[in-house]
């Protein structure tokens, strides 16, 4: 004897229990259905027929009893295998049509094929052919609200047939239709039955049930009658119908839906875009958090990087081969060490030293006419422009003869020129008072800019070392020594040679201090990096707020689209498919927000550049901020997506 395609044994289904009363909906159903049968299950409202249909269609599980499908115990199947059965074996036709409102007729029909991994061209052609066969060839692009009830039900039937529809489960298919549309739907079901499909019709209307070849009546959760209206043998089964012998193999091969992810991803992206467009205002408010977050991170990092590059360029312009030598106290109670001019001469003889220059200077008051200014005044020798790569742009630097004669001449920095003389007065040849001592301006240094913080290299005046010692400070000993090494790549070696010589000259006393420009540049770079990190971290808080907004909107979306989730599950979507669907939508929000944030950041950066603010956009910073937006979408979209994936199919389908 042929194995029944569907075999129910003592099926019971109960709800409630615990704190709520126990309700027994099915009280022990025994039922067998063979391939090729057209069966009507009839009963009054509350008789349990819809619950039975949900169990038959693998949307729900019985409380007890045994359900064998093609010889396989359904209770032993996992969630992915049940999804495969819903996708490949069953086709649902619901009383309320259950079409996705935002999708066209063709997109609704194609849904089961997407989850089956059918190639796009093949599923487009099959969906169009099914709709044309059902008289909807001209309505493929219409949304459900643009179709009549009968047309929507025909779309539902086409969807049920998309993957073959070996077993058609029709729950009150004519209940919401007028008599003419109802007759058309029943004629379609008759035709499907005649082609060998198993048709299981759930209805309370005995006239509708009479169209079937077998009528099973249910009352109070029990089968009260099982009548064959046509004693002839069942029609031959659909040639593609599932057979017991290969079901387990097909389940193991097909439950993974290999290749389906591409179609699902495209479907998820299209669905996400439709939902975003339909709820444009809400989407814009949600995106605002991501946009502001990404823009803030990018701009903050760009400002930090711009400031860093500016400072590094200015510091590097003084030369990375520079070493500074200062006297210092070896301990808190000892006097500060002194570097003499004789020691300067000895250091200048080292082969590692290219040039050496003593500096005797300090902050001093400067006046020209009735304009007062405070500036650093440094007594240097003629090596100053060469050591610091600092050319004179107006006039000339003082000469060796000026140094020998302690001439009262001065070369002023760019900022000093601006403060004392403005744009229109030629400073060359003019006399300024430095601590009330007159000095003639012979040159103006090129603009360098501030190196760090409030230190402005352009706010300085260079005078001969001898003039500084005699005319201003009254001391021959230098304030500090500037040393230019021969090899910029081996400053450490030169520093070691200088330290060894000073150890001998100072009899081993550590009353001096050596610092080099390269180390200062590295330290400043670390400081600037820390500042940039701090700015980026502050800005990232707004991105976090944007992520919370994404999670909020996705939770609302899951709640609003609970029925859609149920529809997708009924057409064969696995939990992982639903998870991917809603996770993709969350990422889509983040992608759009991230792109808009990057564009906004570039616009803000352009505005800052016009305002003379140092800004430097880097690919890692922009890509990193965008990647953070994507990660934010994944992290904050995961919980809503997981919630959607865990919904019960029956509860989702019946939600309002």
From Swiss-Prot:
EC number of the protein: 7.6.2.-
Transmembrane segments: 284-304, 538-558, 589-609, 619-639
Annotated ATP binding sites: 43-50
SUPFAM superfamilies in the cross-refs: P-loop containing nucleoside triphosphate hydrolases
Membrane topology: Multi-pass membrane protein
Compartments where located: Cell inner membrane
Record-linked SMART domains: AAA (SM00382)
Superkingdom in the source lineage: Bacteria
Biological function: Part of the tripartite efflux system PvdRT-OpmQ required for the secretion into the extracellular milieu of the siderophore pyoverdine (PVD), which is involved in iron acquisition. This subunit binds PVD and drives its secretion by hydrolyzing ATP. The system is responsible for export of newly synthesized PVD after the final steps of biosynthesis have taken place in the periplasm.
Family to which the UniProt record says this protein belongs: Belongs to the ABC transporter superfamily. Macrolide exporter (TC 3.A.1.122) family.
Protein name: Pyoverdine export ATP-binding/permease protein PvdT
Source organism of the structure: Pseudomonas savastanoi pv. phaseolicola (strain 1448A / Race 6)
Organism placement in taxonomy: Bacteria, Pseudomonadati, Pseudomonadota, Gammaproteobacteria, Pseudomonadales
